[in-house]
Amino acid sequence: MLDGIHKIHLIGIGGSGMRAIANILIQKGYDVSGSDVAESAVISKFRDMGATVHIGHNKEYVNGVDAIVRSTAIREDNPEIVAAKEQGITILHRSDIVKAVLDVTDGIAVAGAHGKTSTTSMIGQILVEANADPTVIIGGEVDYLKGSSCLGKGHFSVVEADESDGSFLKLRPHTIVITNIEDDHMDHYKTMDNLLNAFCEFVETLPEAGKAIVCGDNENIRYVMSRVKRTFITYGLENNNDYVAKNIHYVDSSLVYDVYHKGINISRISLRVPGEHNVLNSLAAFIVAHECCGVENRFITKALGKFIGAKRRFETKGHVGGVWVVDDYAHHPTEIKATLKAAKELEKHRVICVFQPHRYTRTSLLKDEFATAFTSADEIYMTDIYSSGEDPIAGIDGRTIPDAVEAATHKVVHYVPSVDDIPAVLAKIVRPNDLVITMGAGSINQYGPKLLAILEEGLQ
């Protein structure tokens, strides 16, 4: 897969994007080492699989390796990067490994502002159900993989394509899925035009016989379609798409809808995950399996009916005393709005949203969109911004989004500056039949279990 390379060192091996790559490389038989800032269960797993993993970063860790693999998040002054440059060691981006996987398979790449992980996971689960033995690489963790990737022997691969840093343009898939395009990742793209141009380039990487499965409801995707000459198959809720989800309704706790192709009802899907956004994600997965992989309808419907979601995607953390605690990765206004709407539709719960803003740049650029993203929540709690390594921006702080929400909707936002205080604050106000959702891309996922522990202690 990687000519002339045997010993590979991964910087940040335990990170959400790198762990999937590490697992593939170890299974392929490469001599893998890595480094990260802290111990974790996944690092222990890699050691058990034969990898050498160091805690901390040191220039000596790259001695004798043929290549190092990094992500965009790794700084240039990292001692292992510096040493690799000094020694002339090949430096690969994680997307180079994803490309190498796609190059030797019939590759499917899923991109978009939201829904990438869920859609990629659904496609993978369908192919597993159909005994296609796929290779799967995603940015989250799912139960059916017992992690975030698997190395298959079949000729299909399905990968999550990361547009955040432009690295998805290296990939050469045979099939592309674009779930949506929105004004995110402006720290990299600077302007919406640059982002749209990148997606146009992405579609142009398809071979002439390749297909782009895209959500035709999205205005930005329609713009890309007008710019690029490729075969597009559209899906969505609007009737002008090739594939349309209709008759969406709940049956008990299952979300059910019919798949229409050019006006003809061809299938009924039943999902265990909530929300219209998951209807769209599953519809995209259906089309890929049906149109591009030749999977029979019975395998598709069975797999989608078994799908319970990826970790940090409406993930149940537990129930104590009638309080249901869920965690979700939503950190963009559109994701937040969709997730809270889905939560409100489930049953008659009081929905308590606990949001940790992610990055100063995103907070600054999207504060007006954040202002109306929380309307489905009954109670709103917010913490200080999780910087993700960014420098502060003058005039942007933890009160920016709460103030915007209160001004736009007249809803009360409870501002709790320190995220460490969240569990104790919530423990005093929750009651039976509450649904608490922790939301954000930072450290907020650690605090739902802490709330549950306090509630459990209170019952003893």
Where on the chain are the PLM-derived regions?
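P-loop/Walker A phosphate-binding loop and immediately adjacent motor/lid segment at beta-alpha junctions
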Residues: V82-T90, N194, T205-G210, K229-R230, ...
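N-terminal leader/targeting and accessory segments in enzymes
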Residues: M1-H93, I97, E219, V244-K246, ...
